[in-house]
């Protein structure tokens, strides 16, 4: 069977109290809808249609890196109406997986099990259901005396007895495309919400003697939807626990998982140790045998193996093997450290490349610089890279020694094996193998009083 997926993502999400569409809110490092798309792709479906409505430009921008198609639901008239918008772009012979865009906890295994159940039973439609201890807010699955599907009753339309049912509709389905779209055209808005319910199409198909299957999943956690900020925080916590467990089982040590925050797409090599109060975000990649933390935050950075980073901040930085960073270092975007570099306490580096084995031990600012191999930058060194209008380059060639409290006024180049005297302000190029000193003469004046 040819598989397509339709993700319903047109809702406003009023309870989020936000200008953003609900599916655009971030959880575990990326927007909710990207978690759903990832699960669908991991389940083996490449043909994905997203139904957009409120904030469609934002949703489309978020998904711009994905190979998906969009259809527009101008008015939010229910789940059935949302699915109908996809009729023109889904082949009638397809089997379609339908799910909401606000369920970031969904896992590919649950979707695969649903699709396999649908295939084995050769059903026209299959509903993924879950038994929940607290089913409040969910539609209930009604079965006949033989346990077969009867219908789904939405909570607002349910009576007191029906509300006692624990088996709920997850909102995730498999359908024969041609038959579900035919049934949807016969649905109405005669219900408490005044909307076109997708669940009514199931009842119509049942009345037409079509086969309706139920796949009862044990993945209660998987189907949690996000409706407000409380649920967003709960989903964040669950996804972080999953990620931490995945990393620990793959050979990464987390000294205190409860205080460690690692985004879903982060990759970390084995025998790396993550100390407490560490945050690793975005698409960061860390090698093997590193020690990170405590109190470190790394965003969208590439870290080699055997790197030590203590109490520091890294943003879009690239760090080669065996570097030593911190404490209290700040590596800003486009910073590259080659192998064996030391960046010590209270050092800020921006848009610079630091050569193999070079050291910037403490209290320095390096911006728009290229530093060669084996360079030592003394305490208090500043690259003066900005004249109020433009940024300029500083170049330190191999084996340069910069004395403490040196100001390097860019553009400037210090030739290889050269030394600057402590306290100098260097504003002209220094030839190789040179000692450069620039100081005002020292004066001794008598004290008064």
From Swiss-Prot:
<feature type="binding site">
    <location>
        <position position="379"/>
    </location>
    <ligand>
        <name>acetyl-CoA</name>
    </ligand>
</feature>
<keyword id="KW-0963">Cytoplasm</keyword>
<dbReference type="InterPro" id="IPR038009">
    <property type="entry name" value="GlmU_C_LbH"/>
</dbReference>
<feature type="binding site">
    <location>
        <begin position="385"/>
        <end position="386"/>
    </location>
    <ligand>
        <name>acetyl-CoA</name>
    </ligand>
</feature>
<dbReference type="GO" id="GO:0008360">
    <property type="term" value="P:regulation of cell shape"/>
</dbReference>
<keyword id="KW-0573">Peptidoglycan synthesis</keyword>
<comment type="pathway">
    <text>Nucleotide-sugar biosynthesis; UDP-N-acetyl-alpha-D-glucosamine biosynthesis; N-acetyl-alpha-D-glucosamine 1-phosphate from alpha-D-glucosamine 6-phosphate (route II): step 2/2.</text>
</comment>
<comment type="similarity">
    <text>In the N-terminal section; belongs to the N-acetylglucosamine-1-phosphate uridyltransferase family.</text>
</comment>
<dbReference type="GO" id="GO:0071555">
    <property type="term" value="P:cell wall organization"/>
</dbReference>
<keyword id="KW-0133">Cell shape</keyword>
<feature type="binding site">
    <location>
        <position position="169"/>
    </location>
    <ligand>
        <name>UDP-N-acetyl-alpha-D-glucosamine</name>
    </ligand>
</feature>
<keyword id="KW-0548">Nucleotidyltransferase</keyword>
<keyword id="KW-0808">Transferase</keyword>
<keyword id="KW-0012">Acyltransferase</keyword>
<feature type="binding site">
    <location>
        <position position="102"/>
    </location>
    <ligand>
        <name>Mg(2+)</name>
    </ligand>
</feature>
<dbReference type="GO" id="GO:0000287">
    <property type="term" value="F:magnesium ion binding"/>
</dbReference>
<feature type="binding site">
    <location>
        <position position="332"/>
    </location>
    <ligand>
        <name>UDP-N-acetyl-alpha-D-glucosamine</name>
    </ligand>
</feature>
<dbReference type="Pfam" id="PF00132">
    <property type="entry name" value="Hexapep"/>
</dbReference>
<feature type="region of interest" description="Linker">
    <location>
        <begin position="230"/>
        <end position="250"/>
    </location>
</feature>
<keyword id="KW-0677">Repeat</keyword>
<feature type="binding site">
    <location>
        <position position="22"/>
    </location>
    <ligand>
        <name>UDP-N-acetyl-alpha-D-glucosamine</name>
    </ligand>
</feature>
<feature type="binding site">
    <location>
        <position position="422"/>
    </location>
    <ligand>
        <name>acetyl-CoA</name>
    </ligand>
</feature>
<dbReference type="InterPro" id="IPR025877">
    <property type="entry name" value="MobA-like_NTP_Trfase"/>
</dbReference>
<dbReference type="InterPro" id="IPR001451">
    <property type="entry name" value="Hexapep"/>
</dbReference>
<comment type="subunit">
    <text>Homotrimer.</text>
</comment>
<feature type="binding site">
    <location>
        <position position="350"/>
    </location>
    <ligand>
        <name>UDP-N-acetyl-alpha-D-glucosamine</name>
    </ligand>
</feature>
<dbReference type="GO" id="GO:0009245">
    <property type="term" value="P:lipid A biosynthetic process"/>
</dbReference>
<comment type="similarity">
    <text>In the C-terminal section; belongs to the transferase hexapeptide repeat family.</text>
</comment>
<dbReference type="GO" id="GO:0000902">
    <property type="term" value="P:cell morphogenesis"/>
</dbReference>
<keyword id="KW-0460">Magnesium</keyword>
<feature type="active site" description="Proton acceptor">
    <location>
        <position position="362"/>
    </location>
</feature>
<dbReference type="GO" id="GO:0019134">
    <property type="term" value="F:glucosamine-1-phosphate N-acetyltransferase activity"/>
</dbReference>
<keyword id="KW-0511">Multifunctional enzyme</keyword>
<feature type="binding site">
    <location>
        <position position="139"/>
    </location>
    <ligand>
        <name>UDP-N-acetyl-alpha-D-glucosamine</name>
    </ligand>
</feature>
<dbReference type="GO" id="GO:0016020">
    <property type="term" value="C:membrane"/>
</dbReference>
<dbReference type="InterPro" id="IPR005882">
    <property type="entry name" value="Bifunctional_GlmU"/>
</dbReference>
<keyword id="KW-0961">Cell wall biogenesis/degradation</keyword>
<dbReference type="Pfam" id="PF12804">
    <property type="entry name" value="NTP_transf_3"/>
</dbReference>
<dbReference type="GO" id="GO:0006048">
    <property type="term" value="P:UDP-N-acetylglucosamine biosynthetic process"/>
</dbReference>
<feature type="binding site">
    <location>
        <begin position="78"/>
        <end position="79"/>
    </location>
    <ligand>
        <name>UDP-N-acetyl-alpha-D-glucosamine</name>
    </ligand>
</feature>
<feature type="binding site">
    <location>
        <position position="376"/>
    </location>
    <ligand>
        <name>UDP-N-acetyl-alpha-D-glucosamine</name>
    </ligand>
</feature>
<feature type="binding site">
    <location>
        <position position="365"/>
    </location>
    <ligand>
        <name>UDP-N-acetyl-alpha-D-glucosamine</name>
    </ligand>
</feature>
């Amino acid at each position: 069977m040819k598989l397509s997926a339709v993700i319903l993502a047109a809702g406003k999400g009023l309870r989020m109290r936000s200008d953003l569409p609900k599916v655009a809110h971030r959880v575990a490092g990326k927007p909710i809808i990207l978690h759903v798309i990832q699960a669908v792709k991991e389940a083996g479906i490449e043909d994905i249609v997203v139904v957009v409505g409120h904030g469609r430009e934002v949703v489309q921008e978020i998904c711009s890196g994905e190979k998906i198609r969009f259809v527009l639901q101008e008015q939010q008239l229910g789940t059935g109406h949302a699915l109908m918008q996809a009729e023109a772009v889904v082949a009638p012979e397809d089997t379609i997986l339908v799910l909401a865009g606000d369920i970031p906890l969904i896992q590919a295994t649950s979707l695969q099990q649903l699709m396999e159940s649908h295939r084995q039973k050769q059903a026209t439609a299959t509903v993924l259901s879950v038994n929940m201890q607290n089913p409040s807010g969910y539609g209930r699955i009604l079965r006949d005396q033989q346990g077969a599907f009867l219908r789904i009753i939405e909570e607002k339309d349910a009576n007191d007895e029906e509300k006692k049912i624990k088996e709920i509709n997850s909102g995730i389905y498999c359908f024969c495309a041609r038959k579900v779209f035919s049934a949807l055209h016969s649905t109405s808005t005669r219900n408490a919400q005044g909307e076109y319910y997708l669940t009514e199409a199931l009842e119509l198909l049942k009345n037409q003697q079509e086969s309706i299957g139920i796949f009862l999943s044990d993945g209660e956690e998987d189907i949690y939807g996000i409706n407000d900020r409380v649920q967003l925080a709960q989903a964040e916590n669950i996804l972080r626990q999953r990620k931490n467990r995945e990393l620990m089982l793959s050979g990464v040590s987390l000294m205190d998982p409860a205080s460690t925050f690692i985004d879903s797409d982060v990759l970390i090599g084995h025998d790396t140790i993550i100390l407490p109060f560490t945050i690793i975000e975005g698409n960061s990649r860390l090698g093997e045998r590193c020690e990170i933390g405590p109190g470190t935050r790394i965003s969208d950075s590439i870290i080699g193996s055997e790197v030590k980073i203590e109490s520091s901040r890294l943003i879009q930085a690239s760090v080669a093997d065996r570097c030593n960073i911190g404490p209290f270092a700040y590596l800003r975007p486009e910073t590259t450290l080659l192998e064996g570099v030391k960046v010590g306490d209270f050092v800020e580096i921006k848009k610079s490349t630091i050569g193999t084995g070079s050291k910037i031990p403490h209290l320095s600012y390096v911006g728009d610089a290229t530093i060669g191999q084996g360079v030592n930058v003394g305490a208090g060194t500043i690259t003066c890279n900005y004249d109020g209008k433009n940024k300029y380059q500083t170049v330190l060639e191999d084996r340069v020694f910069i004395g403490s409290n040196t100001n390097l006024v860019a553009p400037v180049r210090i030739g290889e094996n050269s030394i600057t005297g402590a306290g100098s302000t260097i504003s002209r190029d220094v030839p190789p193998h040179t000692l450069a000193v620039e100081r005002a003469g020292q004066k001794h004046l008598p004290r008064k009083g």
